[in-house]
């Protein structure tokens, strides 16, 4: 079930939290793979989410922050690292994307792997089991220019919402696994 909502819609945020909680509950390990670069305002959504998530919930297993971004040049290496270090983990990919004018500032949960770079005509490997995308600007004839001319304020606020929702879902996941492990003992 895919979800799309304006980032300021509290009902949408609650729906996202409920769906994320449902998706991760049966997995022992959850990895958050935040894709993008802080060198382009529109593409900084992923690294901002990763940074905010690590601040809110330091135990989260996050790849991709402002300090250590995951981008086109290192994506394959990071995906390989995740597969080796976290076999069988459930991976949630986070990235910015371009869309219709009417969809700008929307957050989407898509229940299939992410195709990073598709909006700017890059061919990169699919990543994640599900993905969260923030529609940061409109798509068009010159996608590189559009993603560069995106308001950081909007991206920042969307990243805060995504990170906060992920933190809540992961905290609930940790508590569930702790109780589950106690019952198994």
Describe these PLM feature segments.
Residues 1-91, 96-185:
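N-terminal catalytic or cofactor-binding beta/alpha core of small enzyme domains
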């Amino acid at each position: 079930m895919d979800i799309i909502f304006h980032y300021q819609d509290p009902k949408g945020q609650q729906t996202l939290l409920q769906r994320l909680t449902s998706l991760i509950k049966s997995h022992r390990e959850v990895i958050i793979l935040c894709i993008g670069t802080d060198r382009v305002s529109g593409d900084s959504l992923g690294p901002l989410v990763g940074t905010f998530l690590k601040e809110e919930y330091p135990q989260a297993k996050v790849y991709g922050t402002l300090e250590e971004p995951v981008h086109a040049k290192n994506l394959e290496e990071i995906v390989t690292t995740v597969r080796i270090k976290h076999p069988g983990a459930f991976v949630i990919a986070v990235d910015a994307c371009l869309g219709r004018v009417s969809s700008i500032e929307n957050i989407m949960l898509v229940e299939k792997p992410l195709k990073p770079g598709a909006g700017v005509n890059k061919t990169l490997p699919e990543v994640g089991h599900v993905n969260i995308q923030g529609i940061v600007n409109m798509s068009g004839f010159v996608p590189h220019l559009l993603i560069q001319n995106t308001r950081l304020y909007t991206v920042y606020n969307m990243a805060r919402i995504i990170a906060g929702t992920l933190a809540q879902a992961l905290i609930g996941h940790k508590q569930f696994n702790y109780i589950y492990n106690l019952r198994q003992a």
